[in-house]
Structure formats: C-alpha cells, structure tokens
C-alpha cells in the first residue's frame, strides 16, 4: 500500500493541524454583531410635502375681457401653426429607415426555388425514361 505522502488525493499533513487562533479578531467580531442593521423598507410613493398641503389654494384669475381672449386666441393659433409646420418638416426630413430595409431583400432572389424546379424536372425525365424501357 502506498504511503500517505505519495497519494495525490490526500491533503498534506500540515493541513490537519488547526491554525493559530487570533484573539483580537474574535474580539472585533463580537462587537460587530451587537449592532443590527434595520431592514430596508420598500420605497414609499412620493407624496407632496406637508408644507404644500397647508398652503392655501391660489385664487382663480379674474375673468378676461372678450377683446383679450380674441387677441390671445390669435397668438395661440399662430403658435400652434408654427409648431405643426416644424413637426411636419422634421418628419419629412427624417431618414426613412423602414423603407430602406424593406427594399433590400427584394432585389436578391433566392436560388432555392430554381434548384428545386431543376431537380424535379430531372427526376421526372428519369422516371419517364425508366417507364419507356419496360
């Protein structure tokens, strides 16, 4: 039977002896567990600050005269038209990635249907030839 030293499976004999104990590390370890960390809570939903709740609501604006409404309506309409024109020009000037990708596969035809058709026609010719010999 081989000696325990020659066996690769066995651990070295030095590993069987326990390492020297470190006393300062144990003392530090005892101090750490005494303080427990609080469990983490799920994030709460955001709510307005308490100071905002106690603030009085803003008074409603005074009614505007008919003339002021007409003037501001024209300004709003002009601003809306400008925004629509800008959006339209942005859309027209954008690259159309989908149209380019859709046109790429169309020019390249797959050779598979052609190969299948040629193979079937050759098999049909061989079948006809065999039937005529009989």
Curated annotation (Swiss-Prot):
It comes from Mycobacterium tuberculosis (strain ATCC 25618 / H37Rv). This is Histone-like protein Rv3852. The chain crosses the membrane at residues 111-128. The keyword Cytoplasm does not apply. It is a single-pass membrane protein. Residues 23-48 have a biased composition (Basic residues). Its main location: membrane. The lineage of its organism: Bacteria, Bacillati, Actinomycetota, Actinomycetes, Mycobacteriales. Disruption phenotype: The deletion mutant displays no growth defect or morphological abnormalities, and shows no difference in nucleoid position or spread. Loss of the gene has no detected influence on the virulence of M.tuberculosis. Absence of the gene disturbs polar localization of Wag31, resulting in disturbed nascent peptidoglycan synthesis. Deletion of the gene does not phenocopy the effect of agrimophol and does not compromise M.tuberculosis survival at the pH levels found in macrophage phagosomes. GO terms for molecular function: DNA binding.
């Amino acid at each position: 039977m081989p000696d325990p030293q020659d066996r690769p499976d066995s651990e070295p004999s030095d590993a069987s002896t326990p390492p020297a104990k470190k006393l300062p590390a144990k003392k530090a370890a005892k101090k750490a567990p005494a303080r427990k960390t609080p469990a983490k809570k799920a994030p709460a939903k955001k709510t307005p600050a308490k100071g905002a709740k106690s603030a009085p609501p803003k008074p409603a604006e005074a009614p505007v005269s008919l003339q002021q409404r007409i003037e501001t309506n024209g300004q709003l309409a002009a601003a809306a038209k400008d925004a629509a024109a800008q959006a339209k020009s942005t859309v027209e000037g954008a690259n159309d990635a989908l149209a380019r990708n859709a046109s790429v596969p169309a020019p390249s035809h797959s050779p598979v249907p052609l190969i299948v058709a040629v193979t079937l026609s050759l098999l049909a010719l061989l079948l006809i030839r065999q039937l005529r010999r009989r």
